[in-house]
Amino acid sequence: MAYHGVELQTSITIGKIFSIHYFEYMSNFSFAGESHNFWEFICVDKGEVGVTRGKSYTILKKGDLIFHKPNEFHDVKATGGIAPNLVVISFECNDDAMYFFNDRLLQIDETERNLLANIIIEAR
């Protein structure tokens, strides 16, 4: 009996991981901002934050996720209500497929929240 394999296609390859963090901030938290030559995403686990990326300002709530593309200036500030908890992961990826995430606001579900929690646990 002959076995036939299935060839897999690679669409997104992470070359390096720079940081994996879970932050529990105060309700008056403010980060003045930065830019760097790698991707980063921020996901709100609790509370609410205002994020500037380039010239765009967005309010993120629980379950919201955005990507910062390489060299994009970005900052984050708590909105003053519920103290925010954030997942922040930064990484190198040179694949064109990543540009799908430019300027998008995504919402994650409970399954995806659990996957992020497992990544945080593994990174400790």
PLM features: residue spans?
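Amphipathic alpha-helical segments enriched in hydrophobic/aromatic residues interleaved with Lys/Arg
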Residues: M98-R124
